[in-house]
Amino acid sequence: MYGILVLEDGTIIRGDGFGAEAEVLGELVFNTSMTGYVEILTDPSYKGQIITMTYPLEGNYGVEKEWFESDGIKAEGFVVKDMTGLELDEFLKEYNIPGISGVDTRYITRKIRSKGVIRSLLKTSTNPITKDEETELIKKVVEYPDISEIDLVPEVSTKETVTYNAENEKTSCVLIDCGVKQSIVNCLVERGCSVIKVPYNSKKEEILSYNPDFVLVSNGPGDPENMLETVDTVKNLIGTLPVTGICLGHQLITIALGGKTYKLKFGHRGGNQPVKDIESGKVYITSQNHGFATDDKIVPAGSELMHMNLNDDTVEGIRKIESEDIKNTVWSVQYHPEAGPGPHDARFLFDEMVELGIKFKAEKAY
């Protein structure tokens, strides 16, 4: 099958198509993980994006459902140097996702690194793609909006409330689902936490009706500035019970506290990002997947930075300056402590979430 990748600057990259015969548009990004292609493809945060893998060989250890981070592939397309194994090919076909192989992913990555993320089109076809078609494809890419103009979270958030581990709880959490990864739910459940997953646009009153011990705002795709409805809910919850966040959830908490976010040139996507705990000086290697970040020049009043990225000094964690009342606790991290895929250095943060919930639950009893 023929494959073509068209970039907004008119660059044409031809290769071998695999997966579904399809045409998709999206923001072209790169991921530096050496393994974890199943988790990456099924991560809802990749909605609206075409993923280029920097590691040259993909598909060499198959596909298992237990590795899924959602109910299927959420990325728009897949770009690899070499694809091996029929399972990855069939996996993409099952979810109608095109892929292209036999291309210079190093060239693509360096282009993104120098110019920033790029609007692009990926097409696969059993018929040769002609020069005349190229002109039309370039036009489609140029007319495609920037990802910050697309409201992606409603496409990946749950439509109804889902409860996990209801019978065996030490504490309970309402998880505001902006596109949550299953690994996050699993990390909470493994620690004896009941998780009530609710839609991204749930209101404060509905969330409190579940009598949770803390709230976790999840990861997800797109620009946090598009999610003012969720920001308002988070703002209204702060001071009522402990509030935590991961990735997009961290950005929403930043805005709710009065801070600002901005779009990174090419983002952080991979399992090898070093993060420093400002207070302790400890460094963790973390898994990350984000294209927006907290502006360190506008730290919200009454808040402080927790963690910084050692590669580019961007903000990786923020918290509300602690008060004696646990209900005022607010903290969030930009990286993914659950990994999925990646290192587990920061999974202790889920222990801290659960301990926070247990403590608040005990105080509520009085």
From Swiss-Prot:
Biological process according to GO: 'de novo' pyrimidine nucleobase biosynthetic process; 'de novo' UMP biosynthetic process; glutamine metabolic process; L-arginine biosynthetic process
GO molecular function: ATP binding; carbamoyl-phosphate synthase (glutamine-hydrolyzing) activity; glutaminase activity
Highest taxon above the source species: Archaea
Keywords: Amino-acid biosynthesis, Arginine biosynthesis, ATP-binding, Glutamine amidotransferase, Ligase, Nucleotide-binding, Pyrimidine biosynthesis
Pathway annotation from the record: Amino-acid biosynthesis; L-arginine biosynthesis; carbamoyl phosphate from bicarbonate: step 1/1; Pyrimidine metabolism; UMP biosynthesis via de novo pathway; (S)-dihydroorotate from bicarbonate: step 1/3
Active site: 247 (nucleophile), 336, 338
Catalytic activity: hydrogencarbonate + L-glutamine + 2 ATP + H2O = carbamoyl phosphate + L-glutamate + 2 ADP + phosphate + 2 H(+)
EC class: ligase
EC number: 6.3.5.5
Disulfide bonds: none
Domain Glutamine amidotransferase type-1: 172-363
Ranges where the record places region CPSase: 1-172
Keyword hit for GTP-binding: no
Binding sites annotated in the UniProt record for L-glutamine: 45, 220, 222, 248, 251, 289, 291-292
UniProt cross-references to Pfam families, sorted A to Z: CPSase_sm_chain, GATase
Function, in words: Small subunit of the glutamine-dependent carbamoyl phosphate synthetase (CPSase). CPSase catalyzes the formation of carbamoyl phosphate from the ammonia moiety of glutamine, carbonate, and phosphate donated by ATP, constituting the first step of 2 biosynthetic pathways, one leading to arginine and/or urea and the other to pyrimidine nucleotides. The small subunit (glutamine amidotransferase) binds and cleaves glutamine to supply the large subunit with the substrate ammonia.
Assembly and oligomerization: Composed of two chains; the small (or glutamine) chain promotes the hydrolysis of glutamine to ammonia, which is used by the large (or ammonia) chain to synthesize carbamoyl phosphate. Tetramer of heterodimers (alpha,beta)4.
Similarity comment: Belongs to the CarA family.
Name this protein carries in UniProt: Carbamoyl phosphate synthase small chain
Species per Swiss-Prot/TrEMBL record: Methanococcus maripaludis (strain C7 / ATCC BAA-1331)
